[in-house]
Amino acid sequence: MEWRRAFSKKKLEEKVKNMDAKQATDYLLEKVDEQRNLENKLDKRLQNTRKKNKNKEKTRTWAEKYPPVDYYSPEFVENFMKDMRREEFEKSEERRGHKQVRLGSDNFVGDDPLKVLSEEALKAGFQHTGKVMKRFPADVFEKSKFIGMYDRHLTTLREKACCKKERNQIQSKLIQLRQLKPSCDFLAGTVSGVPGSGKSTLLKNVQKKLKNSVCLLANKELKGDFAGVPSVFSVEEMLLSAVPSSFNVMLVDEYTLTQSAEILLLQRKLGAKIVVLFGDREQGNTNKLTSPEWLHVPIVFSSDSSHRFGPETAKFCEDQGFSLEGRGGEDKIVKGDYEGEGEDTEVNLCFTEETKADLAEVQVEAFLVSSVQGRTFSSVSLFVRENDKPVFSDPHLRLVAITRHRKLLSIRADPEVWVSFMFATREGEEVDTHCYGEEHRPDEAE
């Protein structure tokens, strides 16, 4: 039955505009009850009227006699209904014995991808930070001015490309950057954890459970670790892919290895409505606008506990200013000279190409620390020379270097280098917030 509204839309909107969602919902539900009581009274009056007089003219509905003078706006009604659905969802969650962790705004509570992420993160031992995922407008690329700076950065790289293949790859990114239009608003949040906290395992579990999501690996060398997980690509693969793709959720592994503009370009290319970044914020470098941290994506889940190594490594990290808790098995850190005999280990690491070449001269194969972020080994030998100081002075890269092992870390360095390594800082380094990339033109500042 239609009935006249007893309350003015404008008055209700004015009343609830300064309330939070719960207060507004309680207030509006109370008014709904009052309106229903009024409806019942009117209905009874109409029934009595019909009994007394069968004349159709006299038994018109109350709404026909007195048409509504003030309808609610569609937006107001939609928001009101969302509040009601949210409250009903929260009540159902409480009845099942647990309270729903909210990652999104009221519009997104109970949405399947966010619920899966929440449940799996808590199950993996991650703590909810109390923050919700941040909503970004579809044109954030333009509003942040990253798009112009990234365009000039790619143009410079294309001009300096050393081969046709590299030039074509950069050109492909430029074409997409200039042709792709804003697709949709999106939510973004970060899952941050110390090395060994279980980020990759969590990511795999989330990706397996979601229906329309893609997992992007910043380190392409990790692709073998994701065997059996659907829709897994490297960031570079997806950026260069000519096949149109669309995913509701975009998950990025080791996001600190990506660039801020790459994340925005990928979101636009895929039309993703939810973007979740997985990584360790301590392993990122925020001194350049290329860092994803300049997007200010909130951390929604975090973990300071490592299951990879034990207390000795945790103490060693703490001595260098890194805070984490070692909950793994027995581990060991040993010191040795750069030259001479040392512990036999699964892999050798170093910081620079020069040190890598120096080791190759004596038939010692080594990998750069920057190439193994996200990977783990049973035992590691880390070779450090004095000439490596500009690189190992970066605390983010140093943390990667000393957390790749599970049982044994052998640091091979001469005594004078050891002191520099333990107390290294980036002297004179300045934050560069007006340009994008290592090399830029003077007119790049916006």
Curated annotation (Swiss-Prot):
Q: Which GO terms describe its cellular component?
A: host cell cytoplasm; host cell nucleolus; host cell plasmodesma; host cytoskeleton
Main location class: host cell
For ATP, which residues are the binding ones? Answer: G193, V194, P195, G196, S197, G198, K199, S200
Residues in (+)RNA virus helicase C-terminal domain copies: 304-444
Keywords assigned: ATP-binding, Host cell junction, Host cytoplasm, Host cytoskeleton, Host nucleus, Hydrolase, Nucleotide-binding, Transport, Viral movement protein
What GO biological process term is on the record, naming one? transport of virus in host, cell to cell
Where in or outside the cell it occurs: the entry states:
Host cell junction, Host plasmodesma; Host nucleus; Host cytoplasm; Host nucleus, Host nucleolus
SUPFAM superfamilies under this entry? P-loop containing nucleoside triphosphate hydrolases
Q: Where is the (+)RNA virus helicase ATP-binding domain?
A: 160-303
Keyword set includes Hydrolase: yes
| Catalytic reaction equation(s) | ATP + H2O = ADP + phosphate + H(+)
Swiss-Prot/TrEMBL cofactor(s): Mg(2+)
InterPro entries reported for this sequence:
(+)RNA_virus_helicase_core_dom, P-loop_NTPase
Region annotation (Disordered) maps to: 40-60
Top-rank taxon of the source lineage equals: Viruses
Q: Name one GO molecular function term.
A: hydrolase activity
EC number(s) on record? 3.6.4.-
Q: Tell me, how does this one assemble? A: Homooligomer. Interacts with movement protein TGB3. TGB1-TGB3-TGB2 complex formation is enhanced by ATP hydrolysis. Interacts with the suppressor of RNA silencing (via N-terminus).
Q: What does this protein do?
A: Participates in the transport of viral genome to neighboring plant cells directly through plasmodesmata, without any budding. Multifunctional movement protein with RNA-binding, ATPase and helicase activities. Engages in homologous interactions leading to the formation of a ribonucleoprotein complex containing plus-sense viral RNAs (vRNPs). ATPase activity is probably required for vRNPs movement complex assembly. Intracellular delivery of TGBp1-containing vRNPs to plasmodesmata is facilitated by TGBp2 and TGBp3.
Q: Which family does it belong to?
A: Belongs to the virgaviridae/benyvirus TGB1 movement protein family.
Protein known as: Movement protein TGB1
Organism source for this protein?
A: Peanut clump virus (isolate 87/TGTA2)
